């Protein structure tokens, strides 16, 4: 049996069909688009506004492990003027910071302390791994050093070097600002139907691992 949907004529008060009641049927897809195009644009504008404020007001946590921390602090001097990027306000408490820079060698004894400080930071939060020791353990391939801080923390930006220069740290801030501006950062703790759960946030290395493995042609240093 074929069914035909007829739009009701509200002006005539259903005079065309006096013996039956006609229900007005609206297209749910059309209503969905009308509703969400407008609300979606407002949501996008709000997210862009929030991301703009976040990327220009980063609050790094005053936290260092070894020699790379000296290069990080050098970026806060008047020579480099990191205040141009809105991240010159070092916070003494993790509850007032949203960026953690792992500058130095992460020892196994320090890993639980770093994890606890990271958990106390504000949401959303970002992690910068600064230096070869923080990236992969560096030259300390021994039992007492964690071979990469991304073993227990989700890292967003990696800074190579031993130690990296302050300009490299400033370049990392620029990359972090682009990252914040382009994506909607999820919260680590999510409230769902089954209660509150911890969202797994993989590091940048894990996310790009398959793409890097499939690379056949390597780019020159000028194109990187």
From Swiss-Prot:
Locations listed in the record: Cell membrane
Gene behind the chain: nuoB
Listed Gene3D superfamilies: 3.40.50.12280
Molecular function terms, GO-annotated: 4 iron, 4 sulfur cluster binding; iron ion binding; NADH dehydrogenase (ubiquinone) activity; NADH:ubiquinone reductase (non-electrogenic) activity; quinone binding
GO cellular component: plasma membrane; respiratory chain complex I
Annotated protein name in UniProt: NADH-quinone oxidoreductase subunit B
Residue numbers binding [4Fe-4S] cluster: 67-68, 133, 162
Cofactor note: Binds 1 [4Fe-4S] cluster.
Purpose of the protein: NDH-1 shuttles electrons from NADH, via FMN and iron-sulfur (Fe-S) centers, to quinones in the respiratory chain. Couples the redox reaction to proton translocation (for every two electrons transferred, four hydrogen ions are translocated across the cytoplasmic membrane), and thus conserves the redox energy in a proton gradient.
Catalytic activity annotation: a quinone + NADH + 5 H(+)(in) = a quinol + NAD(+) + 4 H(+)(out)
Keyword Zinc among record annotations: no
